[in-house]
Amino acid sequence: MNLFRTAVFLLLADVAMAQAPSGTQAEGQQPTPPPAVKSLDLSAIDKTADACTDFYQYACGNWMKNNPVPSNERRWSRSFSALRERNLYLLWQELDAAAKNPQSPLQKQYGDYYAACLNTDLVEEKGLEPLRPALKRIADLHDAKGLGSVIAELAAQGFSAEMFHFSIEQDKTDASKQIATISQGGMSLPDRGYYLGEHFRYTRTQFIRHMTAMFMLAGDKDAEAFNDARAVLNMETSLALASANGIDVRDTGKYYHITNVADFQKLAPDLDFGVYFKGVNAGRFDTLNVATPDFFRTLNRLIGSQSIDVWKSYLRWHVLTALAQDLPKAYRDQDFFFFGQRVAKQKEPLPRWKQCTEMTDAALGDAVTQDWVKRNFSPSSKASMDRLIATLEKSLSDEIKTLPWMGADTRKAAEEKLSMIRNQIGYPEKWRDYAALNVDREDLVGNTLRSAVFRRGSMLSKLGKPVDEKEWEVTLATVNAYYSPSMNSVNFPAAILQPPFFDPEIDPAVNFGGIGVVAGHELTHAFDDQGAKFDGKGNLRSWQTRDDRKKFVEQTNCEVAQYGGAVAAPGDDDDDAPQQNLNGKFALRENTADNGGLRIAYLALRDTLAAQGKSVDDKIDGYTEKQRFFLGFAQVWCENEEKLPRKRPLIDPHLAGPWRVNGTVQNFEEFGKAFACTKGQPMYPVSSCRVW
């Protein structure tokens, strides 16, 4: 007992020290215009490096030397990070103007949302009071029979404290329909590996310290807070053990189990899902997709075996952590101490104006970006992107016609699917209507909760209705692109259609190396190990023959071996982490898409130049068009990252920049020819891998 008390005392001393993490004054930094991002930056090239030995160092070396990771970022890239910085500033200009002098009801709505977030004096004045009703409702819970009612009430108010994930999604076997889906969830950390892996042992210790501090801020006594924190970690660890791992969960076919509601309730009879579904206004449905049945069996055992006090601690924790950034500075600092410093490796939090810009975009994305898109993405840019995508699709079609591992039946099905892909470029045809969302300039927590209720209501309203094929899954300020297998669509938000990815004023080589490779990457997802399970209508129906499926796996095994043998990061004794190798299987889909996207984009460039009477051997600024293509591709992935790459391969199938560049060009012979490499050099190996 004395040893236990000593351990608690030492931990709480650490907690006290952790409640004022350094650097939080950065919240008050004011916006400054970020520098413009060049489409191709020849000054970034490290000419002391050999392109045939380490192309990433050659293309990015000087940029890496001159662009350290900012203290409020976990990593910094020449493309995604720099462009996100620019877009945030442009969005801030819209929000700042709307907050001070709105010119329309829509501008007043998002201007008030932003202003409420920025008013930290009022946040301090209100303290924890906005959460008191929810915390009291949890405190009044007397037994496990009331869990369904409580989590439903919390969800209906905008909180997210469920131990699972409930949503309305497309029916995997009939993509024209939308059905209820329920699956694993309930964890605070980014991935189940954080709870189970030895690599994250120290992170878990810090997690307990963080939760203890948060509970103490909310009024718990020290030992009580520590015990509550341990109980939450144990609970979430049990949920993690019951959850599918990162590789399995990406296999869509394994997570489709249509079940009637009564049979689903039998999986977890101790949690009244009927009360929950009614409480969140889910509407009437007789069947649902139970994606992870075993998870709910385990959840039921936990409900029966854990005391009601443990569940109350779990629910209180999820209410606190979900709203931490809307609470007084002590909570924000503590939230940053763990999720920012420990998990994301940031030294300082984002300035408040950035946090509020991101929060407003998340809540009112279509409202905020309507005016922004008009000023930053012209109709002519959209037309240029339309033409580029059409050229890429033709190149992919030509490749499908000649792939040696693909038989006639599979080839025909692949061409049919390609012809049915829909491209959404820039912005939606119809903007989301936020008229039903009430925004109060003096109620930050209320705005956040009402926004969550609005989003949940919009999602639940889809049940039983035809799918809106023109709906976007992300806001237009998102610097990313994605392929949706259920929609069979490739989507390019306006935010990514800017330099360095896309510039209608620069030579085609750089555009094809930038956005062209990204688009080719997304297109090949329609035909990878998961894309092959969905037909052109988005239905879960395999269109590869059994023999061709076997040949496809044989082709990809080469990439599994190629990437899987490489060291991602050396061990770090100071941070509880051994050497990490790349996981060739976990990253296979993304690696295959990188390789396919590069090849398709290059062929599309070659054909585009030929149609203009030009050649890939023509020179601009001392580099041939094909060299500029590969440089444009590589410089998209120029990045600096501190420590995180060591654990990144465990949780992220997207590899770090050096491998996305070097691992890809090694497999494309045209690269070796472009830079006059000798066969056998690292970037021009004697043997290589090819799927597409």
State where each predicted segment sits.
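Hydrophobic/aromatic-rich, well-ordered segments within soluble, folded domains that form packed cores
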Residues: 45-65, 194-216, 588, 596-600
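Short, Gly/Pro- and small/polar-rich lid/capping loops
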Residues: 28-43
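Active-site-surrounding "flap" and adjacent substrate/cofactor-binding loops of secreted or lumenal enzymes
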Residues: 33-36, 49-54, 58-128
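Sec-dependent signal peptide recognition
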Residues: 2-9, 14
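Short, solvent-exposed loop/turn elements at domain surfaces
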Residues: 63-67, 189-190, 500
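Intrinsically disordered, low-complexity linker/terminal regions across diverse proteins
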Residues: 31-33, 232, 238, 266-271, ...
